[in-house]
Amino acid sequence: MTVPDSVGTFAAQAVVAFRRAKGAPDSLALDLVGLTVDSVTAPGASRAARQERRPFAYDGRKLRIGLRPRRGTGVESVVVFYHGAPADGLFLRPDARGRPSAFADDWPDRARDWLPTVDDPADKAPVRWEVSVPAGWRVVANGRFVRRDAAGGGRATWTYDERSPIPTYTMVLGAGRMTASRHRPAVLGNDSVPIEVWAEPEDSAFADSVPFRRATEIVETMERLVGPFPFEKLAEVESSTRYGGMENSTAIFYPEQPYVARRLSEGVVRHETAHQWFGDAVTERDFHDLWLSEGFADYFAVVVGAALDGDSVMRRGVAGLMRGYLRSPVVGRPLVDSAETVLTRLLNANSYNKGACVLHMLRRTVGDSAFWRGIRAYYREYRDSSVSSADFQRVMERAAGRQLGWFFTEWLHQPGYPQLDVAWRWDSAGRRLSIDVTQTQPAAWGLFTLPALTLEVAGGSGPPIQRTIALSSARQSVQWDAPERPTDVRVDPDGDWLLTAQVHSQP
């Protein structure tokens, strides 16, 4: 790919490798939007014809390439020569200080605006970049840095190679006048992961000392919790992404504005780093299962923060996730919302906050040992591939040694959350406390099962008394001895469950 010296068009040739499925037609369809296709070639039928032109049809959205009749089951390839000014996906524009730059930004389906691909999260592929830029520029991209070659005309070509299959929405490059610093590598056993911080020169000191100060420790913590880092390096990059952070494989892009304002937080860094495991290495097969990416990243941002800074981070973090969901406009829709057709609308509190809370509640349901056994098995089994919520459920059921269909049905496919009315009364004659718990959420949300709901009763001179009940019906009553009248009854005092509760006493 040739990136221009200033804002304008680019030119590229893409080598697309593929295998034909049995019975597939003698053609290849690629997503490519709004560019000019100059020609398409493929290896010739003989050694004398090393490359030959292939017929193609291009309607501005789909590129259909005619292929020779299938000659086996091996890997084939075509080369697409094209150019243009992308309307989206690859942004050739000035950086925050007015210098020319180029940055890709592909989620959810904008790789097709500049790359001829099968632009679908279920179709992952390795990628190799050879990017020609002005000699004073630097280039960052997916994978291992291979080399920088000087070229004529005051230009240089940078080569990167990512050998693991990654989703097209994380296939990116960034180019411009940037600085790059190396932090201490992340080490797990005999493996070492280079950690790089890329920024505009004016922002490099801030980037190194504030948001990415513990970038290495974050990676090492994730490795201990989940498994080995899945790629060759991790670069933290100041860019022109439209998102608060974009988890591109091996090269996370962050927007310029928080750098300029000196407000980029470590919480965002933990979230995006967690995506390297969940989203990049293990990718949702369908965007309606986006919680497998965003919910995981939100939860592990909190878990890693707690591992680094103490359990209070866990309590505050989970409580914040729950508050964010309960205040959101999507509580009336299921987490896995297959009716939503606008993909960007899936970037909501269901996919993020509720998805993270589902993991926390699953952990409370099966216990720490089974939860972590399942998480590690899930990553190990599905690394470098694509998954569904059903795949995750199967792994967790195996780890827990029991069926969890009720849990995933209620929390993924039913909308809403439990709304509880909790009425208590104290019998002074019998010294007994009675508590009635009623689910009052809209009928369309259905009922929820809370297998270990804690009730805490305070009163008298002694410490609060806690009892755990299994709530599995619309209404449940419990009684126990209470020598003194309670002064307070609390529901789920540790914040383990995504719910609301109205507590009141009865005469």
What do the predicted segments below correspond to?
Residues 36-43, 140, 404-405, 418-492:
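Beta-strand-rich binding/interaction modules
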Residues 27-28, 32-98, 152-159, 471-485, ...:
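A surface-exposed beta-strand-loop module
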Residues 340, 348-436, 446:
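Amphipathic alpha-helical substructures
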